[in-house]
A protein has these predicted regions:
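Conserved N-terminal beta-strand and adjoining loop/helix that marks the start
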Residues: 1-22, 43, 74-75, 93
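A short coil-to-beta-strand element that immediately follows conserved catalytic motifs
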Residues: 65-74
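A generic structural micro-feature
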Residues: 3-7, 33-36, 80-86, 102-105
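NUDIX/MutT-family hydrolases
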Residues: 91, 100-133
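Conserved Nudix-box catalytic region and its N-terminal flanking loop in Nudix hydrolases
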Residues: 20-60
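Active-site-adjacent beta-strand/loop module that shapes the phosphate/pyrophosphate-binding cleft
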Residues: 19, 75-98, 109
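Short secondary-structure boundary/capping segments
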Residues: 5, 13-14, 29, 80, ...
Length: 136
């Protein structure tokens, strides 16, 4: 019997507070992308709903309470460490709390759209943020 290739599902959460989006810098001591500025992200656990995963990841990585929009901003195929995955990008609105970083990140910023590219946030994420940015 052959072994099936695993297809992971991950979520990325664009957390907004008014007209700014949360961006976090990966820990310099971490194995995965040290120094990379990104949004909240993580794998969906087996049997877990992607929206529940999005809420869980935000709480684990930031300590914030958010409301996650049910309709994803986008989804795309990616790979990490050679493993294929589907990434579902959600938009969330900050409800309460102050950011308390987990060991995964060294710093955070509430950014305006132009700052994302300046920080070196991956272009695919900048495009998703542009689509999700609050109007007005």
């Amino acid at each position: 019997m052959g072994e099936e290739a695993r297809q992971w599902v991950a979520v990325t959460v664009l957390v907004f507070r008014r007209d700014r989006m949360l961006s976090m810098c990966r820990a310099a001591s971490g194995a995965a992308g040290p120094g990379l500025w990104e949004a909240v992200s993580g794998r969906v656990q087996s049997g877990e709903d992607p929206i529940a995963a999005a809420r869980r990841e935000v709480t684990e990585e930031t300590g914030l309470t958010v409301s996650v929009q049910a309709r994803p901003v986008t989804a795309y195929a990616a790979s990490r460490r050679g493993e294929p995955m589907t990434v579902i990008v959600f938009r969330a609105e900050h409800e309460e709390g102050e950011v308390v970083l987990s060991e995964e990140h060294d710093a955070y910023r509430w950014c305006v759209l132009a700052e994302l590219s300046e920080l070196g946030v991956p272009e695919q994420l900048v495009e998703a943020a542009r689509d999700a940015w609050p109007s007005g």
